[in-house]
Swiss-Prot record:
Identification of the protein by name: TBC1 domain family member 2A
Pfam families reported in the protein's UniProt record: PH (PF00169), RabGAP-TBC (PF00566)
Gene Ontology MF term list: GTPase activator activity
N-acetylmethionine: residues carrying this PTM: M1
Entry function: May act as a GTPase-activating protein for Rab family protein(s). Signal effector acting as a linker between RAC1 and RAB7A, leading to RAB7A inactivation and further inhibition of cadherin degradation.
First-listed, main subcellular location of the protein, grouped into a coarse class: cytoplasm
Region (Disordered): 1-41, 231-278, 904-925
GO-annotated cellular components: anchoring junction; cell junction; cytoplasm; cytoplasmic vesicle; plasma membrane
InterPro entries per the UniProt record, alphabetical: PH-like_dom_sf, PH_domain, Rab-GAP-TBC_dom, Rab-GAP_TBC_sf, Rab_GAP_TBC_domain
């Protein structure tokens, strides 16, 4: 067993694992009583080694039960070893904590917790709840430190393969700062954990026979022999003076000074003692309150007498204030009367002192005017007095109401004080009485409440720990997932390199075979054997590699059912197909993280589809497999929404069932020729041929002008493979034939198709003059190859992933995309075509050269960048010019045909001499 060969102790009483681990993390501590109030973080100077006695549940039969074991942690391997005693040289067994999770149950026995590994569940029990929590937290921390100390992630070979590693590491660092929010660190129980715990008395140690591990009997015997030898060697050392302790004990006492054991968790007292204590406290409280109630009553009486005196004094002050105001008013009135008398005296003196009558008359007039003015002032003051009197009456009424309200409040207050006095007397009497049956019920309820509080605290602690464990396991899972992702990316890169090397190897074998020819018999035979072995590698390795890693081999079919490696009868073609499949797989692996993943993310964030420049660029780059059906339905709806009607497709199917169409026979013949390299159309139990038949028959009734034309079966089949619905595939076919392609493209004369071939020749002369000159010198007609490209939009020509990428852009932009990709295909293979000098070799190469294209990104860049400028106006002009010339040629051909028929009709049927007639031939037996 790994880890069992630990270095033995020099003496039987020493502990072999007592060395402190270098760089061990410092553990912050806090007492359990502080958990609810908040966590303080005092740092411990030297954390003790994680070791101590725990009880392990195990055994079989009658000896099954708790067994005391000495546990110690190995930081190098992240293993928790255990032995029967601390003095044993060899551990009994170990627990791998790197992939373990921890659990504690609130309803289990106090101090019990579990360690769950993928292989087994170990149940352990600590002496106290505090020791259990300390062990769990330390094991969590050690597990995380081990995962954090693993070697760094492998460096990616390409920047595109780096992924989101830095972001995930930053997220993990941020989570480390928050991990302590679940469960506060527990104070170290120095008497139960650490090297010093080896000399502490073990709590409730089982009997010696029951404590022996029969499962590890050999290890038990070895440990016993080691202990016996150690005791013999150290027998003299045990009689040294008391002051001469061993260095290990001195070091242990210096490093870990065990604090005096704190008070343990209070046990649950019996019911009688709890009731008596509660009764005593309640009676003591009642007596103290009864001593205060009489003083409170006397105070209330004194307060009432003082309030009445204050009220009488206030009323007396109010009366004296009113009397003072009246005296002041009287003084003012007398003062005014005195002033009026003095003024009258002065006026009379002035009147008598006047010498002439004129002066006296003037004085009289002046007084008359003053009297009139005073009369007006008196009237104004009278009006003001009346308004003030009204205001005063209103205020007096309000004052009376307020006084009534105050009196009401005083009455209420007095009534409440009386009620308080009565209740106080009643409470005092109740407290003075002995506890009765109701009090005993109350005490029992109080006891139950205390038990429930204990249970609630236990469940709260369990919940905090489980949250902490979930957080820790999640962090470890994310770290492992990050490493796994980096390893998968590296594996994909190496697989791509392997595919490239294998394709180069096969290409080299093919070139050697071509160079040797049939001259060297032994070498040719050796090359043939090597090629056969290379072609059989895929089948032999597929079963073995698929178990290890799914993308390690090339699957037989792609996601749409097309063969990835076509089965050719000719050995050279099979070799080329294998090389092509390896190159496609290599490009797919290299582009998965660098190109496809960002593209998938952009499509995932794209909301509702709407025509835009961004959507145009995304469609040119290709639609991911999971988004393609939705995008195609939206593109088709844009094209045929003016033609769609509810129930139209079903009506066409019903019409086809009622009446047989003339094109039904040709459709039936073409069904078996549709995509022979696709499993959906070659499997006898597949439903795709029946769906395709119904779609083509419905279209023949939808468009009677065209009916059915060879090539429509491939267009409808592509739509069925992507959309997987008959009606959607039908409207896709309608969109292509009636809205995207020009008129007469699928007519009997294929007029528009022939026009596009001539337009393509002009564009090739403009964009690729060197290639066209090379082909022109060898009299190669490209229309034999390109005519079918345009008729079926490259179906059966390009490999499936490139074909569907072309269709993504074709359904949005139209026929212009077909011209771009046709030019790009010749540009992609221009150098290979220029190396061929014989016209027969060129024709042979043109028949399969589209299958050699494996880099879809390069082909797309050529089509939409290297072929620019590509104005639609130029395309329309070329089409118009060639259509006019082609129509003239067709008219001339029709005239020649009519003249020929007239000539034949004028000559009549001519029968060669000596040849028997049909009647004679039929008459012969």
């Amino acid at each position: 067993m790994e880890g069992a060969q630990e270095s033995p102790a020099e003496s039987g009483s020493s502990v072999p694992w007592s060395e402190e681990p270098a760089g061990s993390a410092k553990v912050p501590e806090v007492s359990l009583s502080e958990e609810s109030e908040g966590c303080t973080r005092p740092l411990e100077a030297t954390p003790p080694k994680l070791c101590g006695y725990l009880s392990k549940f195990g055994g079989k039969g009658p000896i099954r039960g708790w067994k005391s074991r000495w546990f110690f942690f190995d930081e190098r391997k992240c293993h928790l070893y255990y032995s029967r005693t601390a003095q044993d040289a060899n551990p009994l067994d170990s627990i791998d904590l790197s992939s373990a999770v921890f659990d504690c149950k609130a309803d289990a026995e106090e101090g019990t917790f579990e360690i769950k590994t993928p292989n087994r569940i170990i149940t352990l029990k600590a002496a106290t709840k505090q020791a259990m929590l300390y062990w769990l937290q330390q094991l969590q921390m050690k597990r995380w430190e081990f995962h954090n100390s693993l070697p760094a992630l492998p460096a990616a070979h390409d920047a595109a393969l780096a992924g989101n590693g830095p972001a995930l590491r930053l997220e993990l660092e941020q989570e480390e700062e928050e991990e302590e929010a679940f469960l506060c660190p527990v104070k170290t129980p120095t008497d139960l954990v650490g090297v010093a715990a080896a000399w502490q008395p073990v709590h409730a140690r089982p009997l010696a026979l029951q404590n022996i591990s029969l499962k590890h009997l050999g290890t038990e015997i070895q440990n016993t022999m080691c202990n016996i030898r150690g005791n013999k060697q150290t027998q003299g050392a045990n009689h040294r003076p008391p002051g001469e302790d061993s260095p290990l004990i001195e070091e242990t006492q210096r490093e870990e000074q065990p604090s005096p054991p704190g008070p343990g968790a209070p046990g649950k007292d019996p019911a009688n003692s709890l009731k008596s204590s509660l009764t005593t406290s309640l009676i003591r409280k009642a007596k103290s309150q009864s001593n205060t109630f009489p003083l409170f009553s006397e105070g209330l009486m004194r307060n009432r007498t003082a309030q009445e005196k204050v009220l009488a004094l206030e009323q007396q002050v109010l009366m004296l204030t009113k009397e003072l105001k009246a005296q002041k008013e009287l003084v003012k009135i007398l003062h005014k009367a005195l002033e009026a008398a003095q003024q009258e005296k002065r006026v009379s003196s002035a009147y008598l002192a006047a010498a002439q009558d004129k002066d006296r008359l003037e004085l009289v007039r002046h007084k008359v005017r003053q009297i009139a003015e005073l009369g007006r002032r008196v009237e104004a003051l009278e009006r003001e007095r009346e308004s003030l009197a009204q205001t005063a009456s209103l205020q007096e009424q309000e004052i009376r109401e307020l006084q009534q309200h105050v009196q009401l409040l005083l009455d209420k207050n007095q009534a409440k004080q009386q009620v308080i006095c009565k209740l106080s007397e009643k409470v005092t009497q109740d407290f003075m009485k002995a506890p009765e049956e109701a009090d005993r019920d109350f005490l029992s309820q109080q006891e139950k409440m205390e038990h429930l509080k204990d249970d609630m605290e236990a469940y709260r602690t369990q919940n905090r720990f489980l949250n902490s464990e979930i957080h820790q396991v999640t962090k470890i899972w994310r770290k492992v997932a990050e490493k796994e992702k980096a390893l998968l990316m590296k594996c994909a890169y190496l697989q791509a390199q392997n595919c490239q090397v294998e394709s180069k190897y096969l290409a080299g074998l093919r070139r050697l075979q071509e160079a040797l020819g049939v001259e060297a018999g032994e070498c040719s035979e050796l090359l043939r054997q090597l090629i056969q072995e290379a072609l059989q590698w895929e089948a032999s390795e597929a079963s073995a590699d698929s178990v290890v890693l799914s993308p390690s081999t090339i699957s037989e079919y792609d996601e749409y059912g097309f063969l990835t490696v076509p089965n050719y009868e000719v050995e050279d073609l099979r070799l080329l197909a294998k090389i092509q499949a390896l190159e496609v797989h290599s490009h797919h692996l290299l582009a998965h993280e660098a190109v496809e993943r960002p593209l998938r993310e952009r499509w995932a964030t794209l909301g509702e589809l709407a025509p835009s420049a961004e959507l145009k660029q995304l469609l040119r780059a290709g639609v991911p497999h999971e988004h393609r059906p939705r995008v195609w339905r939206w593109l088709i709806r844009l094209r045929v929404q003016h033609l769609q009607a509810p129930g139209c497709y079903q009506a066409l199917l019903s019409r086809g069932q009622a009446c047989k169409h003339s094109a039904a026979r040709q459709i039936e013949l073409d069904l078996n020729r549709t995509f022979p390299n696709n499993k959906h159309f070659t499997c006898p139990t597949s439903s795709f041929p029946d769906k395709l038949r119904r779609v083509l028959l419905a279209f023949s009734w939808q468009n009677p002008t065209i009916g059915y034309c060879q090539g429509l079966n491939r267009l409808a089949a592509i739509a069925l493979l992507v959309l997987d619905e008959e009606e959607s595939a039908f409207w896709c076919l309608v969109a292509i034939v009636e809205t995207i392609m020009p008129a007469d493209y699928y007519s009997k004369t294929l007029l528009a198709s022939q026009v596009d071939q001539r337009v393509l020749q002009d564009l090739l002369l403009e964009k690729l003059p060197r290639l066209m000159a090379h082909l022109g010198q060898r009299h190669v007609d490209l229309s034999f190859i390109t005519f079918n490209w345009f008729l079926v939009v490259f179906a059966d020509s390009l490999i499936s992933n490139i074909l569907l990428q072309v269709w993504d852009a074709f359904l949005y932009e139209g026929i212009k995309v077909v011209f771009r990709y046709a030019l790009a295909i010749f540009k992609y293979n221009e150098e290979a075509l220029l190396r061929l000098q014989d016209s027969l070799e060129i024709y042979q190469y043109l028949h399969f050269f589209t299958k050699t294209i494996c880099d879809s990104r390069k082909l797309m860049h050529i089509a939409f960048n290297d072929m620019n400028p590509f104005p639609m106006k130029q395309l329309r002009q070329l089409r118009a010019a060639h259509r006019e010339r082609l129509e003239a040629e067709l008219n001339e051909l029709e005239q020649l045909k009519a003249e020929y028929l007239e000539t034949r009709a004028a000559q009549g049927p001519a029968v060669p001499e000596g040849s028997p007639s049909e009647d004679e031939g039929e008459a012969e037996p």
